Amino acid sequence: KLPGQSAVTAVSAFVAAPAVGVFMTDRLYHENVYTHKEACCVATNFSVVSLGFFALLVTITDTQYMYGKVVISSLVIVFILAAIVIRIPPLSRKKDRYYNGVEQTAAMRKSSKYSKDTMKKAVAASTTKVSQTPYSIFVTSIPGVLSFTVKIVTFVQALATIALFISNYTPFFDWIGMPMVPYLELCQMPDAAAIAPATLVGIAEIALPVMTIAGMNIAPMSIFFVIVLSTVQIIFFTESANAMMQSDLNLKFPELVLIFLIRTLIAIPIVAVFAHVLF
């Protein structure tokens, strides 16, 4: 369903930040590598947080020993969710049209299967690509990077301040988390009432779920659940979602909220299974 170049987004996000993954996806869309549908699917499914941010999340809850489990579980679940979410509206209804307006045909879709020669071909292709890339591309890319950065930074600062204020000084997130308690209890998660708000606050800022439970006397399984869930939700408006809205992918606020809710509802039982197996 997705081109192999989607690995570029995942790697960019893992080593840098979700916004970098979105930027790379937007750029590949501009270069007519992705169709609009492919770009939207890649951005909303593979713009994961960086490995460094994973470390920050486990540090906040003083559970550094979980780092390996959290990273591997999140990576696996991200791919499971991607296979499901891209087949559900609104992503399934996006047009297979390139940036230049050309409709993608069946003949244009490259069907490739993994084989023992795949890695060798990938290394050869990457080496060829690097050798053909002029150094001037780094200079010509600077204006685009700066423009994209300016677009999202001001919005991020404003939204992060508002989100933190609402989380710390109002019961708003506690209220919206209440309907999730029965769902978490159905998944047999310990401390369901305590972690329920953390399942939804991540739409504002990815660190909020972990900050919500930090210092609470809850089971390690529940801590693992909250950390992994927050990282696989992908959509949070202080960075990734904001970057998507500022890109040319034309993803609207209501669409991103809907994708967040879909990802969350599907991810909860999957993450719960991982939590029960590992703990």
Please place each PLM-identified region on the residue numbering.
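C-terminal transmembrane helix pair
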Residues: 35-85, 207-279
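Hydrophobic transmembrane alpha-helices that form the pore/transport pathway of multi-pass ion
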Residues: 1-47, 214-221
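Transmembrane helical segments that form the transport core of multi-pass membrane transport proteins
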Residues: 128-218
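Intrinsically disordered, low-complexity non-transmembrane regions of multi-pass membrane transporters
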Residues: 91-146
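Short, amphipathic, aromatic/basic-enriched membrane-interface segments that mark the entry/exit
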Residues: 38-44, 126-127, 195-196
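Short helix-coil transition sites and intra-membrane helix breaks within transmembrane domains
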Residues: 10-20, 169-171, 197-208, 231-237
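Transmembrane helix-loop junctions in multipass membrane proteins, especially transporters and channels
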Residues: 29, 63, 86-98, 168-172, ...
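Hydrophobic alpha-helical transmembrane segments of multi-pass membrane proteins
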Residues: 8-15, 72, 146-149, 153, ...
